[in-house]
Every structure is written in structure tokens, then in C-alpha cells.
Amino acid sequence: MPTISQLVGSERKRLTKKTKSPALKSCPERRGVCTRVYTSTPKKPNSALRKVARVRLTSGFEVTAYIPGIGHNLQEHSVVLLRGGRVKDLPGVRYHIIRGTLDTAGVKDRRQSRSKYGAKAPKD
């Protein structure tokens, strides 16, 4: 706790909030190009092969992004749209690829939560 004379000399420092997705540069989404598409294993106690991509963004950053949903069509040089949002069991993955935009296809045969996976309405 500062004294009155300390506060007269210099005011209190404002706390600055640190962003959880710095590569987006305060934008809701960013475009990027996949440099590598691969699978990664999660932290304990989980076990899986999570699909991730290394993406070079228009902001100049190169980040690791998660590919949500079952099956994908991404490969090297695919143009993707990224949003914030980490994957809790993959260290260093702080972004999600948005399905159904640019080169990323929506999830096939998806019937529930379709808007989150870029899937069109079923034909029946």
C-alpha cells in the first residue's frame, strides 16, 4: 500500500489486460495459408490424434490451429480463416479454423450444431 507522498510523486499504474490471441491483432478473424497439416497427441489423461495445422497469417504470425469436426480437406497451401479459442488438451494451440469458409469445406453429413461446422441443411 503506497503512502500519500508516494502517490503524489507518481500515480498508480493501470493494469493492462493481456490478450489470449495476439496473432489476431484485435480482429475477430484472420486469413492465413496452411504451411503444414498434421496430427498431434493430447496431454494426459486424454488419448487421440487431434487434427491441427500450422498457419501463416496475414498479420505475419505463424500459429498452430485446430481443425474441428470429423474429416477435413485441408492440405499445404490451403487458404483458411482463423478465430480465437484454445484447445485445452493441446499445448500451444490457441486458434480454431472456421469450417465452411475459403478453402475449408464444411463437415459432411452433420445434422446438429451445423452452423459451427459450416454444414448446409440436409435435403430431406
Swiss-Prot record:
Record-level GO BP terms: translation
Keywords per UniProt: Methylation, Ribonucleoprotein, Ribosomal protein, RNA-binding, rRNA-binding, tRNA-binding
GO CC annotations, alphabetized: small ribosomal subunit
Superkingdom, natural source: Bacteria
Residues passing through the membrane, by range: none
The keyword Transport is assigned to this record: no
Gene Ontology MF terms: rRNA binding; structural constituent of ribosome; tRNA binding
Record Pfam families: Ribosom_S12_S23
Subunit text: Part of the 30S ribosomal subunit. Contacts proteins S8 and S17. May interact with IF1 in the 30S initiation complex.
Function: With S4 and S5 plays an important role in translational accuracy.
Protein's UniProt name: Small ribosomal subunit protein uS12
Organism of derivation: Prochlorococcus marinus (strain MIT 9301)
